[in-house]
Amino acid sequence: MNEQLVNRTMAFAGILQAIAQVQHLARHGELDNAELAASLNTILVTNPDNTADVYQDKIVLQKGYKLILNQLGDSSQKDVEITRYLVGVLALERKLVRSNSGLGMLAERINQVNRQLHHFAITDEQVIANLASIYSDIISNLGPKIQISGNPVCLQRPIIQQKIRALLLAAMRSAVLWRQLGGKRRHLVFARKAIVDTAKKSLTL
């Protein structure tokens, strides 16, 4: 397999994995802690030797690959909400990269979280609150806010709001990586088959 395409597809699976977790959390108000940790940990790997270093939990990433098959493949069951969130994340990623200080501020704030992890687990409420504030302070104001749909009772809970923002930050991290690996929105239209085929092969590895 083309290594660049494999890495790019891995990063794209990372975006979809985090977005699907946002959707699940907004609807049900709960998320498996290991799955949450898998996405949040990707934010903290800022200087990876290779793409696989970013996505340590390969089991959770399989959900991202399956979402690629569903969203870009021939399925008639495409999730319009997932697509809407994806479009929103990719639009904000463009604005982040084009902003003068966005990426630098992001790196600085992520370093602070890394120091916090000497004392807390990544799924600790204090760490999640910190990650959520990074999203609110640096990314959310760059463009139109992503409107999250779900159960109003769940969405009113501050901890759910914070987890959703932290997961959107994780989706943004994967979007930045996807773009760094040569990912372009037109690939999602004109290179769909290659992406789907790569996701299928990655699922069987």
Swiss-Prot record:
Protein name stated in the entry: High frequency lysogenization protein HflD homolog
Taxonomic source organism: Shewanella baltica (strain OS155 / ATCC BAA-1091)
Membrane topology: Peripheral membrane protein
GO cellular component: cytoplasm; plasma membrane
Subcellular compartments: Cytoplasm; Cell inner membrane
Pfam families linked to this entry: DUF489
Keyword terms, alphabetized: Cell inner membrane, Cell membrane, Cytoplasm, Membrane
InterPro entries xref list: HflD, HflD-like_sf
Family: Belongs to the HflD family.
Predominant place of localization: cytoplasm
